[in-house]
Amino acid sequence: MIMKHFLHLIVLLSFFAASACNPVEPQIDSISLSSKETVIDYQQQTMSITVTSSGGWTLTGSYDWAVHSVKAGKSGDSVLISVTENTSGSERKAVFTFRCGDAVATYSLTQQKGPDKPVQPEEPEKPEDPDRPLDPDRLSGTVIGSKYSVDYDNGNSKSTTANTKDNVFDGRYDTFFASYDRSRTWVGLDLGQKHIITKVGWSPRVGQQQRVELALFEGANEPDFSDAIPIWIVREPGVNRTMHYADITCSRGFRYVRYVSPNDVRCNLAELEFYGHPGEGDDSQLYQLTNLPTVVVNIADGEEVVEKEKNLISNVYIISEDGTNLLATGGTEIRGRGNASWDFPKKPYRLKFDEKQSPLGAPASAKKWTLLSNYGDKPLMRNMLAFEVSRRVGLGYTPFCHPVDLIINGEYRGCYQLCDQVEAAKGRVDAKDGYLVEIDAYAYSEDVWFSSNRGTPVTIKHPDEDEITQEQRKFINDYFNQMEAAVFASDYTDPAEGYRKHLDLDSFLKNFIVGEFGGNTDTYWSVYMYKDAADGKLYTGPVWDYDLAFENDYRTYPINNLWDYIYASNGSVASEAVRQMVTRIVKEDPQAKERLIELWETACNEGGLKNLNAVVDQNAELLKEAQELNFKRWKILNQHVHMNFQALGSYDKEVQTVKKYIDGRLEKFDELVRR
């Protein structure tokens, strides 16, 4: 008996010894960055760093000239670092430290110094420039503008006596107005009565020629410029000690006129002139920045949109048809919108008019509209292309969109896309008496949402959150669960009792074609669906959010080298149940596979998908003038932003990337649907 216990003891000791020799391997912390070191020039710009890590990460490093957008995140998230113009006179360097557990990665950013200021001899009273006409129409009035200037000789202090706004009307090139605030500053004239402006003139501060680029001239008849509209935009840097002139074609009379400084340059203007004659004028001919419509948003008290939840009141003016058509509205609400896109420097917005409008010939008459920024989409057309594919595939509703130039509070913000708001309404989603939902990875941040029995997050978009009843919430939740359960049932392919009883197959497959042909990594990260009151089925659509499509995501590049569909490879999904649902329908239901081929062939042959690159060329021509201005405002053609896998430095090269992708995708997707 003693021997037996002794043997048991030896066995136990042997087991513990073996365990000690073979410990469980702990998870190794890891973190890496898309870039470790960057050297940039002295100009204002934004850098984007993508973090890959084994878990959550934190970021440290604080600089007043290089500000990071977030302090923590997860693997795959991007950090934006906004860098101000370097006017310090010397090179400067910032080091940011990323930590994931015990793993550390650093990012080093070096900004070169700006050009040295030329030493200028003191200039006597400036004689009239021979190119500066002695025009009796040169206007005078009360000088108005930003209250405070900056005194560079006294530690950049706030001043009302040094470098003031009066200097721009003193006839001298060696004096200038430099505002204390870096942005949202201006200078102009109160003319005392309405004038038709025929010409404007300007000259940059000596040595600061580039600071006039994208300055905006505006006219108004309210002293707070709440009714201001543009009359000219400066497209190029200036020349030292030179007046630059522009003839103005705007038939409206203005009492107040002003020069609005570009962002982050403190005006830095030497001379300013306005020409014209008294007159009420009319709105028969207004000014557009480019061939695209110009959208002007003047927010009450000049407030800036800084959040998505707070609505600000504004006056909105949409100038189109070469300046001969004007939509003017008051009491329009504006706020931020978007998820990841809201963190970009170029912000997206939502407008809500006080009355229903149909801007730019839109099919819907509605209050709610969106302004998409397309920040990471350098051809500025990927959403427009996705909508075109949607139309050619034959989805029931495709959102209206039109590219526009956007001005907010007198500042040019870039080329945007005016779009429908996705909602259940006449001319939009045909579900006014039914339901509109969104399979949505961000549903948890919404007010009205549910998680399905299989863990799929779903936001209820209609009925609205302030109108929906508990009974309605329960009904659509239960119905979605029934649909999902039917897809995963053993008899799910049964034509009468299977999933097609709850889910419209054609719209599901058409949405699939748009997402997979278009190369959208996030097709099933966000999916709109609506329940038609007539037949009771869930329909899929509309398509939305295609910034990352058409080869614009490093996570799936190169798409046409993937062996399988994107959703089954590296695509983002709101839940694994969604991925499995798509597989069961598209790959494992013989009738659905056959129907997918039919819809694809129809879209190619009758819908004209094979000619989609002609649409790319048309869009590029339409956007030619606007994109030039946009990338002067947002200098990112040489930068990786958001999920970009490349930075080509050229708009034309970015467009060619899209065309090359489409050519290859036509062949690859045809192979996939027939596999």
Predicted regions and their residues:
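Internal "kinase-insert"/substrate-recognition segments embedded within catalytic cores
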Residues: V297, K352, Q357-S358, S373, ...
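Bacterial Sec-dependent N-terminal signal peptides
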Residues: F16-V39, C100, T106, T110-D137
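Disordered, acidic Ser/Thr/Pro-rich linker "stalks" and the adjacent N-terminal cap
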Residues: Q120-G192, R205-R211, P278-G281
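Surface-exposed binding patches on compact interaction domains or structured appendages
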Residues: S30-L33, T52-L80
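Trp- and acidic/polar-enriched beta-sheet ligand-binding modules for extracellular glycan
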Residues: S146, D153, D181-R184, Q208-G279
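A short beta-strand micro-motif common to beta-rich folds, especially ectodomain repeats
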Residues: S90-D102
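Middle-to-C-terminal accessory/interaction subdomains
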Residues: E303-V305, T329-G331, G338-A340, F344, ...
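A short beta-strand element within beta-rich, extracytoplasmic domains
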Residues: H195-G207, Y259
